[in-house]
C-alpha cells in the first residue's frame, strides 16, 4: 500500500518492509536448533565442490584419474556434495520457520524448499553429482580427449553455479551481475583450494609423474 509505514511493536522501525520482514525472520531462525547443523552441512557440500574442482584442475589433460588416491578424492567429493546438499534440503524448511528436529520431514516444509531457488539448485546438484560419478569412471578408463575437457569443464561450471545462483548474491536486486561474479569467485577458490586438497591427498603420486602429470 502506497504511503504505509511498516512497524513492529517494541522495536525501532527502519521504515522499510523488507528490513522488518528480514528482522522477524532472523529472530525466528535464531530459535531453531538447526542453525549449526545446517551451517555444517553447507560446508560439507562446499568441501565436496572443492574436491571435485581440484580433481578437475589437476587431472586436466592427463591420465591422473588412474591414480587410486586422485580417484578417491573425486569420489569423496561426490559423496560430500550429495550428503551435504541433501541434508541442507531436509533441514532448510524447518530452520526457516524456526522448527526443530521433529519438523525436518514435514511434507509442507520440504515442498516449500523444493520450489525455492535453493531447492531447485540442490535438485540440479544431485543430478550433476550422478553425472560426476559417470564422468569420473569414464575418464578413468579412456584416454584424455577434447571431449573429456568439455565434460569436465561443463560439469565444473554447472556445479559451481548451483552454489552461486542459490546464495545471497542471487537475492540481490542486481543478481544478474553479482551471481556471475560469485560464480567466478567460487571457480577461482575451488581451483586453488581444491587443488591444494587433492595435492594433500595424492601429492606423492602426482609428483612422481606416473600418470602423465607433473607438478
Over which residues does each language-model region extend?
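Polytopic transmembrane helical bundles with strong interfacial aromatic enrichment
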Residues: 1-215
Amino acid at each position: 500500500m502506497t504511503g504505509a509505514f511498516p512497524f513492529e511493536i517494541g522495536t525501532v522501525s527502519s521504515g522499510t518492509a523488507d528490513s522488518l520482514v528480514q528482522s522477524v525472520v532472523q529472530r525466528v531462525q535464531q530459535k531453531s536448533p538447526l542453525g549449526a547443523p545446517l551451517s555444517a552441512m553447507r560446508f560439507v557440500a562446499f568441501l565436496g565442490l572443492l574436491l571435485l574442482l581440484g580433481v578437475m584442475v589437476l587431472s586436466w589433460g592427463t591420465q591422473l584419474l588412474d591414480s587410486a588416491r586422485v580417484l578417491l578424492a573425486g569420489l569423496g567429493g561426490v559423496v560430500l556434495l550429495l550428503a551435504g546438499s541433501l541434508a541442507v534440503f531436509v533441514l532448510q524448511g524447518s530452520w526457516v520457520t524456526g522448527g526443530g528436529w521433529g519438523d525436518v520431514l514435514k511434507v509442507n516444509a520440504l515442498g516449500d524448499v523444493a520450489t525455492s531457488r535453493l531447492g531447485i539448485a540442490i535438485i540440479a546438484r544431485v543430478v550433476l553429482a550422478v553425472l560426476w560419478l559417470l564422468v569420473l569412471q569414464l575418464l578413468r578408463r579412456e584416454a584424455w580427449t577434447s571431449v573429456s575437457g568439455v565434460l569436465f569443464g561443463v560439469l565444473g561450471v554447472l556445479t559451481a553455479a548451483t552454489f552461486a545462483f542459490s546464495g545471497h548474491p542471487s537475492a540481490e536486486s542486481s543478481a544478474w551481475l553479482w551471481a556471475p561474479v560469485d560464480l567466478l569467485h567460487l571457480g577461482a577458490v575451488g581451483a586453488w583450494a581444491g587443488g591444494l586438497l587433492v595435492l594433500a591427498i595424492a601429492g606423492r603420486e602426482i609428483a612422481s609423474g606416473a600418470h602423465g602429470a607433473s607438478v
